[in-house]
Design a protein with these regions (language model features):
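N-terminal leader regions that mediate targeting or early regulatory function
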Residues: 1-186, 195, 199-208, 348, ...
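Short linear interaction motifs
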Residues: 30, 68-69, 76-84, 147-152, ...
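Intrinsically disordered, low-complexity regions enriched in proline, serine, glycine
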Residues: 58-61, 88, 97-98, 110-113, ...
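Alpha-helical repeat scaffolds in large eukaryotic proteins
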Residues: 80, 105, 133, 137, ...
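Extended, charge-rich alpha-helical regions
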Residues: 139, 143, 231, 235-239, ...
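Extended amphipathic alpha-helical scaffolding regions
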Residues: 153, 190-192, 230, 363-366
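Hydrophobic, mid-to-C-terminal alpha-helical segments
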Residues: 180-245, 249-263
Length: 476
């Protein structure tokens, strides 16, 4: 049985001190000059950015979102580092690769962030390094600031300006440093992207965020006085917007309309949104499963467009070389794997939150956490999906739980049975004794017995029954 972490929180009198002890250094707001530079570069390089899978991500970076520290601390109290999920009274949920795609615009496909450059790419990188060293020397700086970097490269109209812009974007809005400087560690990625090479930024961003959520949870649990400080540099705006998307009671009073061509993040930017006054801890503690939005991106928005993996009717697709990248992206989102960042590797367990993908939630397996090098972890993440048949649920499907899953959670959380009871029968499909004629199997889904047998026959434990099913030809 999964060990429940100590979720004790500071008493109310200490909450203000706690909030003053946490510094979100990675929370960056775009200034006027950055927006202007992004607009200029977009007009020149949009096709390249689309090819590299960063166009929407860069446009999202031009949107400002004000930090809500109380919300961030409240949701972080629910974090479980054993599973990289949030533990709520009624069950688990987490930030997935799907959320990173929709809210920040990063790609789950492509080469790893540590991908090597060819000879010509290394020459371009070396030019950036030399310019960085020159700026430091001329100004007697230890680091190169955004101001100095933009002064050197902005409006130069040379071939290096594009790469320099991407280096700034990566240093400030993708892999922020604690000291607000241009980080040479991103130069290789900048060169790749400038040439239209797709880099899998989503798993790297999520790996870094998981790692710092664990650090923040530990800080909250061990907090004593305001002298106990912590500095965080990852993209916690994703945590905040994820919470807004999922909990209506915590959303701003008014969201922005989605304008044509704008990224989804723009509905939460600060142009007209007003912070809702809520007791975050109380809302999360008293939340029932019905108050959680399992699939917010399946809701129709004016000027919004559904991806191919949000069909109106459920479907099965064969993964082969001709399959559209959108379906392959969904397969990566629902596959248990390792997430490779620049300086960390984190476990990814989407099987624990299958309902977030419109899939049947079964009892989750024992968590096995094995350490791998970043190369081995990437090979596992990027494992070929050939000859796999992928189930794509309807965007209209409601969340489903196996009866055994709700019973398992009751045993895991006996003190929270009341919240678990809100998993009403309409949400639960039959128990393990259901036969193949059960009418409660979601429309478009093959019979559960067949799905279960396929899973049990599969030796690849990285594919889970509630998500990706490898079907033998005799079953197709």
């Amino acid at each position: 049985m999964l060990r429940r972490q100590n979720r004790s929180a500071p008493p109310p009198s200490d909450l203000k001190s706690l909030s003053l002890s946490v510094f979100f250094r990675g929370w960056r707001l775009p200034n006027r000059k950055f927006k202007s530079w992004a607009l200029k570069m977009s007009s020149l390089h949009k096709p390249t950015w689309i090819q590299a899978g960063v166009f929407e991500a860069i446009m999202s970076s031009t949107k400002g979102i004000s930090k809500d520290t109380d919300l961030l601390l409240g949701i972080a109290e629910k974090w479980c580092s054993d599973t990289n999920t949030f533990f709520f009274p009624w069950g688990e949920a987490t930030i997935t690769l799907e959320d990173v795609m929709f809210l920040l615009g990063f790609s789950v496909l492509g080469s790893p962030v540590f991908a090597a450059l060819d000879e010509s790419g290394e020459r371009v990188k070396e030019k950036l390094v030399k310019d960085s060293l020159r700026i430091k020397k001329d100004n007697n700086f230890v680091f190169v600031s955004q101001v100095e970097w933009m002064r050197r490269f902005m409006n130069d109209d040379d071939e290096l300006e594009h790469v320099a812009f991407l280096a700034l974007w990566l240093s400030y809005f993708v892999f922020p440093s604690a000291y607000y400087h241009i980080d040479e560690v991103v130069f290789s990625v900048a060169v790749h992207v400038s040439r239209g090479t797709r880099i899998a930024l989503a798993p790297a961003v999520l790996a870094h965020l998981y790692a710092e959520l664990t650090l923040l949870k530990r800080h909250i649990r061990e907090f004593i006085t305001i002298e106990d400080k912590i500095e965080l540099k990852r993209l916690f705006k994703l945590v905040q917007v994820w919470t807004w998307e999922r909990f209506k009671e915590l959303q701003p009073e008014k969201a922005n309309p989605l304008l044509k061509g704008e990224p989804r993040l723009s509905i939460w930017c600060d142009d007209s949104t007003q912070k809702r006054s809520s007791n975050v801890r109380k809302v999360l503690e008293e939340a029932k499963v019905e108050s959680f939005e399992w699939r917010p991106y399946t809701k129709a928005l004016e000027n919004g467009k559904f991806p191919l993996f949000y069909p109106e009717e459920a479907m099965w697709v064969l993964v082969d070389n001709d399959l559209d990248d959108e379906f392959v992206s969904f397969a990566r989102c629902v596959k248990v794997s390792k997430l490779v960042g620049i300086d960390c590797v984190e476990h990814y367990f989407p099987n624990r939150v299958a309902a977030q993908f419109g899939l049947i939630q079964d009892v989750t397996c024992h968590v096995e956490r094995k350490s791998l090098s970043k190369e081995a972890a990437w090979d596992e993440y990027n494992k070929p999906l050939d000859e796999l048949t992928l189930y794509i649920p309807s965007r209209c499907v409601i969340p489903w739980w196996k009866k055994s899953s709700s019973e398992w959670w009751k045993k895991l959380s006996p003190e929270e049975n009341q919240a678990v009871e809100s998993l009403t029968p309409r949400h639960i499909i039959g128990d393990d004794d259901d036969d193949d004629t059960s009418d409660s199997v979601p429309s478009g889904c093959k019979r559960w017995k067949s799905m279960k047998r396929v899973y049990e026959d599969d030796e690849d434990d990285s594919l889970t029954i509630a998500q990706v099913m490898r079907l033998r030809k005799k079953d197709t």
